[in-house]
């Protein structure tokens, strides 16, 4: 009898030759899958989230943005005073209980006006950003994917609109249609001239992604051009669009405040940080704090969106991780 060999099994052929066959690995399939999952590379967004979680500025900006959005959506939760309730007896009154920022020259509560002023500014920024992303991303995707004369036409139209400064065009149009001054007119004007950069970024990103191997594989499976564009190219081109949109949102808030500051933005019946800053500048020496609070709210909100955009860009940019 041959000796027992635990690690091998002996088999004989008809010629009498011995062959040694190793034992079957009895490692469970679940354990193999677990190891494979742990060793699998994380997705781009997963790596970006891991990077963002380590950035204190990202969390500070995120908290400020969440607070600004909540204030603009539910201002009545943060103050019980109406922004248009004014009493001349409170002329430049000092801060007191329930009125932590004091009063304006007309006796209005500064804190209430800062709270309600967030609604107009943040709403214009968010809605304008949504509009320019829809317009710019659509045109940029079509131009970058189809190419040819369609790309040439869209690119030339984009260059024409890009050559016109956003704020200057907004001033001209708001003056031309001043009888229709409202929040929707401001959003329309800013969207009409603010989509060009998004279109150029999307076009470049789509042209880069459409040459990737997974797009070639999708074509080999017989997928239609529009299915490839919507299911494969656009989802993988979103990173630079999201980064720019976050930064642009802050820019649109500044644009609205600038128009209201000049008296050609929102109507005087609407509360706006820009309009309050414009009124407070007339008596800056006598009461600087009347200007300080709306200006600080505007600066913090805009800076938070810009910081958020920079943090996301660095998290998604492989060169920034080195």
Show the residue positions of the predicted features.
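Gly/Trp-centered helix-boundary motif
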Residues: 1-137, 141-142, 149, 163, ...
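Amphipathic cytosolic juxtamembrane alpha-helices at the membrane-cytosol interface
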Residues: 108-123, 127, 147-155, 207-211, ...
């Amino acid at each position: 009898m041959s000796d027992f060999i635990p690690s091998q099994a002996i088999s004989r052929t008809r010629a009498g030759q011995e062959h040694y066959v190793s034992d079957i690995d009895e490692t469970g399939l679940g354990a193999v899958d677990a190891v494979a999952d742990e060793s699998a590379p994380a997705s781009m967004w997963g790596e970006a989230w891991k990077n963002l979680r380590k950035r204190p500025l990202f969390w500070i900006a995120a908290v400020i943005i969440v607070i600004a959005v909540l204030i603009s959506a539910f201002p009545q939760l943060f103050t019980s005073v109406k922004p248009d309730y004014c009493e001349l007896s409170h002329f430049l009154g000092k801060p007191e209980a329930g009125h932590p920022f004091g009063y304006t020259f007309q006796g209005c509560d500064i804190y209430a006006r800062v709270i309600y002023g967030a609604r107009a500014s943040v709403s214009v920024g968010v809605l304008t950003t949504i509009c320019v992303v829809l317009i710019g991303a659509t045109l940029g995707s079509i131009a970058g994917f189809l190419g040819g004369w369609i790309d040439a036409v869209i690119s030339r139209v984009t260059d024409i609109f890009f050559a016109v400064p956003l704020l200057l065009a907004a001033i001209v149009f708001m003056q031309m249609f001043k009888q229709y001054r409202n929040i929707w007119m401001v959003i329309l004007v800013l969207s009409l001239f603010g989509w060009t950069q998004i279109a150029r970024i999307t076009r470049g990103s789509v042209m880069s992604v459409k040459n990737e191997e997974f797009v070639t594989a999708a074509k080999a499976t017989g997928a239609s051009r529009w299915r490839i564009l919507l299911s494969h190219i656009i989802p993988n081109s979103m990173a630079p669009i999201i980064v720019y949109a976050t930064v642009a949102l802050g820019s649109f808030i500044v644009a609205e405040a600038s128009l209201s500051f000049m008296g050609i933005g929102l109507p005087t019946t609407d509360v706006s940080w820009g309009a309050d800053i414009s009124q407070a500048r007339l008596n800056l020496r006598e009461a600087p704090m009347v200007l300080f609070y709306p200006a600080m709210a505007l600066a913090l909100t805009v800076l938070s969106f810009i910081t958020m955009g920079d943090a996301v860009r660095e998290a998604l940019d492989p060169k920034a991780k080195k």
